UniProtKB/Swiss-Prot annotation:
Substrate binds at F226. GO terms for cellular component: endoplasmic reticulum membrane. It comes from Balaenoptera acutorostrata. Its cofactor is heme. InterPro entries: Cyt_P450 (IPR001128), Cyt_P450_CS (IPR017972), Cyt_P450_E_grp-I (IPR002401), Cyt_P450_E_grp-I_CYP1 (IPR008066), Cyt_P450_sf (IPR036396). This is Cytochrome P450 1A2. It comes from the Eukaryota. Pathway: Cofactor metabolism; retinol metabolism; Steroid metabolism; cholesterol metabolism; Lipid metabolism; arachidonate metabolism. It is a peripheral membrane protein. It catalyses: an organic molecule + reduced [NADPH--hemoprotein reductase] + O2 = an alcohol + oxidized [NADPH--hemoprotein reductase] + H2O + H(+); 17beta-estradiol + reduced [NADPH--hemoprotein reductase] + O2 = 2-hydroxy-17beta-estradiol + oxidized [NADPH--hemoprotein reductase] + H2O + H(+); 17beta-estradiol + reduced [NADPH--hemoprotein reductase] + O2 = 4-hydroxy-17beta-estradiol + oxidized [NADPH--hemoprotein reductase] + H2O + H(+); estrone + reduced [NADPH--hemoprotein reductase] + O2 = 2-hydroxyestrone + oxidized [NADPH--hemoprotein reductase] + H2O + H(+). Belongs to the cytochrome P450 family. Its main location: endoplasmic reticulum. A cytochrome P450 monooxygenase involved in the metabolism of various endogenous substrates, including fatty acids, steroid hormones and vitamins. Mechanistically, uses molecular oxygen inserting one oxygen atom into a substrate, and reducing the second into a water molecule, with two electrons provided by NADPH via cytochrome P450 reductase (NADPH--hemoprotein reductase). Catalyzes the hydroxylation of carbon-hydrogen bonds. Exhibits high catalytic activity for the formation of hydroxyestrogens from estrone (E1) and 17beta-estradiol (E2), namely 2-hydroxy E1 and E2. Glycans are attached at S69.
Length: 516
């Protein structure tokens, strides 16, 4: 039988199909970097043309990529749109990349959403990783840490952080009592978010921070407009056309960044009007003094502008993770009342009821500390670090990793790795205690990933851990949290840069003893 009779395709159609196949094959090969002899590219699943693995990622990329790591290993590669993305899982692999090979992986990808933060001048989101970035990071970290541990001579508190947290925690207790006297229930997030904002605001701006500003409250209660688009795998970063199409989430993100920057500008300018370099009492004052003393190194930017850019990062580092952690903690407490009772027994034994908890009590409250660590691990509310990128060609675990490759660090996978935790789905604070339940296991606590690693580690980590501890210690000393019988608390997170718990408007709080 002749070929023309055996096939329904014409010679022209077959030729066109062959040409198309060759073109697609050539494009795919062109996308792939040239791999040096003896090395290989990271493995990964087959991807759809144009859209890559976006359908695979779905609404919970941290879960999807954790499943893929079980099949392809700790170093795998996917595509989002046409952009290759390296995904790192496994504690040892991540530590190798971010710590031992930290200089190779310290970059940031040049993503569209990053350019909208602080007009593209954010130290945290900026692709720059050179000496200027390193100096700015040191300055921000030193300012934040200094005013966490520095003390106010007029206060009985050990440091500014303790003074501000104690004040806001007491105010929060009063607010919860007021809500209980009214509706008899509340959503803790709506009120925790304002209290935490007041703490970092007071540390940054001192008396200049507006404690009851409607603008401030509106901003901090709408941070979800930021974290949704700033999350790893945000479509707008990988599909450029989305910048030009109707996109409500992107518009909210732009609006939030614009409003937040304007708010900080106003605060910084007001502070600068009565700045006295001989009387520095907050982070902004310390930054003004630094830039004034080092005016030749200002890089052409006015002190106010440089200060706004840094405060944008400092405020974020000392605000959203802390708010999210406390909110998750309260929900774990109401769903695990026996754990709450153990924490309160520890507080009663160590501190009693005659005085308030202090930061110096932290080492004497191992069960509370274990609960906080388990909240970090189980919720993994920062599922990925802010994306990294490679600044030069390198290798990792025998795989060739080219320069300028976008890198996702899957912290959620580490915190739920059965090889590390045995029963990762169980909420069990005791796992972090030593055999005598008197101290925290340093080895195990260092395996919890929430603040990143290496040269891009979150500058607010120390502040966050201290502040979360003190807020919870004060709240739990005085209040017992619960939900009404029959109410089921939804612990399903909403994916974002930080994953928030679902709103829970049924939380109740009662005083454990009369407050003097």
């Amino acid at each position: 039988m002749a070929l023309s009779q055996a096939t329904p395709f014409s010679a022209t159609e077959l030729l066109l199909a062959s040409a198309t196949f060759c073109l697609v094959f050539w494009v795919v090969k062109a996308w792939q970097p040239r791999v040096p002899k003896g090395l290989k590219s990271p493995p990964g699943p087959w991807s759809w043309p144009l859209i890559g693995h976006v359908l695979t990622l779905g609404k919970s990329p941290h879960l999807a990529l954790s499943r893929l790591s079980q099949r392809y290993g700790d170093v795998l590669q996917i595509r989002i749109g046409c952009t290759p993305v390296l995904v790192l899982s496994g504690l040892d692999t991540i530590r190798q990349a971010l710590v031992r090979q930290g200089d190779d992986f310290k970059g940031r990808p040049d993503l569209y959403s990053f350019t909208l933060v602080a007009d593209g001048q954010s130290m945290t989101f900026n692709p720059d990783s050179g000496p200027v970035w390193a100096a700015q990071r040191r300055l921000a970290q030193n300012a934040l840490n200094s005013f966490s541990v520095a003390s106010d001579p007029a206060s009985s508190s050990s440091c500014y952080l303790e003074m501000h947290v104690s004040k806001e925690a007491e105010a929060l207790i009063g607010k919860f009592q007021e809500l209980m006297a009214g509706s008899g229930r509340f959503d803790p997030y709506d009120h925790v978010v304002v209290s935490v904002a007041k703490v970092i605001g007071a540390m940054c701006f001192g008396q200049h921070f507006p404690q009851s500003s409607g603008e401030m409250v509106s901003l901090v209660r709408n941070t979800h407009d930021f974290v949704e688009t700033a999350s790893s795998g945000s479509p707008v970063d990988f599909f450029p056309i989305l910048k030009y199409l109707p996109n409500p989430a992107l518009q909210k993100y732009k609006s939030f960044n614009r409003r937040f920057l304007q708010f900080l500008w106003k605060m910084v300018q007001e502070h600068h009007q009565d700045f006295d370099k001989n009387r520095v009492q907050d982070i902004v004052g310390a930054l003004f003094k630094h830039y004034e003393d080092n005016s030749r190194a200002s890089g052409g930017l006015m002190p106010q502008k440089k200060t706004v850019n840094l405060v944008n990062d400092i405020f974020a580092a000392g605000f959203d993770p802390i708010t999210t952690a406390i909110s998750w903690s309260l929900l774990y407490l109401v769903t695990n009342p026996e754990i709450q009772r153990k924490i309160q027994q520890e507080l009663d034994t160590v501190i009693g009821r005659a005085r308030r908890p202090r930061l110096s009590d932290r080492s004497q409250l191992p069960y509370l500390e274990a609960f906080i660590l388990e909240t970090f691990r189980h919720s993994s509310f920062v599922p990925f670090t802010i994306p990294h990128s490679t600044i030069r060609d390198t290798t990792l675990n025998g795989f060739y990793i080219p320069k300028e490759l976008c890198v996702f660090i899957n912290q959620w996978q580490v915190n739920h790795d059965p090889k590390l935790w045995g029963d990762p789905s169980e909420f069990r604070p005791e796992r972090f205690l030593t055999s005598h339940d008197t101290t925290i296991s340093k080895t195990l606590s260092e395996k919890v990933m929430l603040f990143g690693m290496g040269k891009r580690r979150c500058i607010g980590e120390v502040l966050a851990k201290w502040e979360i501890f003190l807020f919870l210690a004060i709240l739990l000393q005085q209040l017992e949290f619960s939900v009404p019988p029959g109410v089921k608390v939804d612990l399903t997170p909403t994916y974002g840069l930080t994953m928030k718990p679902a709103p829970c408007e049924h939380v109740q709080a009662r005083l454990r003893f009369p407050i003097k």
